[in-house]
């Protein structure tokens, strides 16, 4: 599984466009892809065809409330899965800064994906790629994304 973070401190440089199009192109090539939206604006979520206001769970629930990441995964109409974001992620740095090992929370959540139990006797196929769309800042969220990448 390759984990890629699309990051830049400057806004408006195409991070979200790159992340969504990369996820879509990989899915089109029959790769199993998970897109993680780590920006409170939720533009990757919206660009993936979802309404960020209607998410049952978001990446904020995973990072701040310890929700297992697989419970926040939603299928998109574009052939890839997403863990969406919304404004619940705003101000998350303050909450994350109070957690132990706050730089590795996303990494631990992704390790849960690798250790997913079998359902109905079938082991779920692991993701070929995880693409992380970062906010335009060097925050604890971006640090989590960088620590979660595969190289």
Identify the role of each PLM range:
Residues 1-151:
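P-loop NTP-binding core
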């Amino acid at each position: 599984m390759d984990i890629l973070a699309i990051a830049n401190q400057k806004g408006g440089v195409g991070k979200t466009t790159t992340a969504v199009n990369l996820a879509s192109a990989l899915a089109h090539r029959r790769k199993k892809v998970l897109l993680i939206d780590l920006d409170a604006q939720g533009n990757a979520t919206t660009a993936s065809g979802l309404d960020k206001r209607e998410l049952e769970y978001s990446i904020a629930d995973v990072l701040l409330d310890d929700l297992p990441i697989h419970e926040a995964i939603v299928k998109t109409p574009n052939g890839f899965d997403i863990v969406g974001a919304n404004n619940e992620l705003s101000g998350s740095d303050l909450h994350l800064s109070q957690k132990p090992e706050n730089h590795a929370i996303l990494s631990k959540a992704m390790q849960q994906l690798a250790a997913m139990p079998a359902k109905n006797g079938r082991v779920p196929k692991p993701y070929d790629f995880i693409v992380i769309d970062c906010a335009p800042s060097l925050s604890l969220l971006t640090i989590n994304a960088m620590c979660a990448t595969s190289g």
